[in-house]
Amino acid sequence: MAEISRQAYADMFGPTTGDKVRLADTDLWIEVENDLTIYGEEVKFGGGKVIRDGMGQGQMTAQDCVDLVLTNALIVDHWGIVKADIGVKDGRIFAVGKAGNPDIQPGVTIPIGAATEVIAAEGKIVTAGGIDTHIHWICPQQAEEALVSGVTTMIGGGTGPAAGTNATTCTPGPWYIARMLQAADTLPVNIGLLGKGNGSNPDALREQIAAGAIGLKIHEDWGSTPATINCSLSVAEEMDIQVALHSDTLNEAGFVEDTLAAIDGRTIHTFHTEGAGGGHAPDIITACAHPNILPSSTNPTLPYTVNTIDEHLDMLMVCHHLDPDIAEDVAFAESRIRRETIAAEDVLHDIGAFSLTSSDSQAMGRVGEVIIRTWQVAHRMKVQRGALAEESGDNDNFRAKRYVAKYTINPALTHGIAHEVGSVEAGKLADLVVWSPAFFGVKPATIVKGGMIACAPMGDINASIPTPQPVHYRPMFGSLGAARHATRLTFISQAADANRIPQQLNLQSAIAVVKGCRTVKKADMIHNGLQPNITVDAQTYEVRIDGELITSEPADVLPMAQRYFLF
């Protein structure tokens, strides 16, 4: 076989096994673990290239070929960092493997025919669409902002810019749940709604799940008492949905130990588990040690920087309807903001003790920065802590898998949607984000939603080619008209499906049902299942694991930041 240099090969077909790629302007380097495209048989589209009739394109009809192939992609997912072609059919991932013409090429698992479109992913990174599980539905425009950042699934609650929604992620009651499901039918992302879990009458909670909510949110602003926690979890066990918890900062109804006793070993998703976003002061962070607790962070405290503390007080006062002229309100806000626990949070992510990242959109968090901030934490931890013990070789592959899992597969597992989304695997909805390595985690090159391009940077519409400035993100055909309904999912509960809620509401989008929410445990959080022996000093707020102080230094400079947003 004729040979070319490794550099020439990478320029033509993208990096291959053993090549390394830098992620944006971070200190993170990934190494290609395997290449499934078969040397000498690679497919590529273009003038004089391979995907032509009788060459890389076969003679089969649409029934026997894929609708879309992403060629020579470098996949970064929880299961590996692999070069492969990705085939998509009927809006779902058909296979990850070798694309081409099976009549003349060996090892083809993704047949290309006249019905096949091509996205050229040579030299590009492909990840699964992000999943944000902490959405305050304050305004519908959040969906567009999230989508252009690489997030394709949004889970949360709310009804618009009402005081309740500004503070809590709850869509309260069957009437609002119905209206929000109808409104979400027009959004270009997958959605799932959380009902209000603050209630001691189980029927008031059951009716919300039966109306279409995929989970319940318990929030201290509505009263996170042991009674409401127990009631919500009892209904959850009965109806197979998840419960999300923002616990009692003021410790009015009990301490963290009382909340854990009310949870009683049942699975629960704890929001902003560090505590600045809310939760038992100062030691809600210790909840991450328990096998039934699925701990997440919201992004205002990620990563820890020299500005983190200063910006939090004003954010908190606005979001939780507090009055700066009332001393008790100020004291409440200040009790949630602790340098010591914030400094420990990044480390807890790096060792896999915190399992998920999310936004807290417009309610202290930034909906378009889940992915950016997750990778900024990964960078900061490499700079401060060096290579992880789990790494093999001179690369950051394990760290990359750990961090990508925090906003893809682990939120999917937590909320019972991993059978539909959350990874680049056959059978799942083709929600795929294509990145140029230099812009990884910051600005996607293409966002594929349900097998069709939904959003992409696009140049002057009157130009002779697609690239002249001004270039900015624009909605594409996959997010327009009835195509939007065909390429997105609305998640509902099993009870709502049995009640034919989508038919009653005349929803046009594809429907998916959540399942397995009650059996998932911390150990199931991929690369993020550590259950440390963690303590917090009640006076100094210092965090320790097995007696060792856990802390980090605040950053004064970050990658993936201003240099990317000058244009």
Curated annotation (Swiss-Prot):
It catalyses: urea + 2 H2O + H(+) = hydrogencarbonate + 2 NH4(+). The active site is at H320. Pathway: Nitrogen metabolism; urea degradation; CO(2) and NH(3) from urea (urease route): step 1/1. The keyword Hydrolase applies. Ni(2+) 1 binds at H134, H136, K217, D360. The modification N6-carboxylysine is found at K217. Belongs to the metallo-dependent hydrolases superfamily. Urease alpha subunit family. HAMAP family: Urease_alpha. This is Urease subunit alpha. It comes from Enterobacter sp. (strain 638).
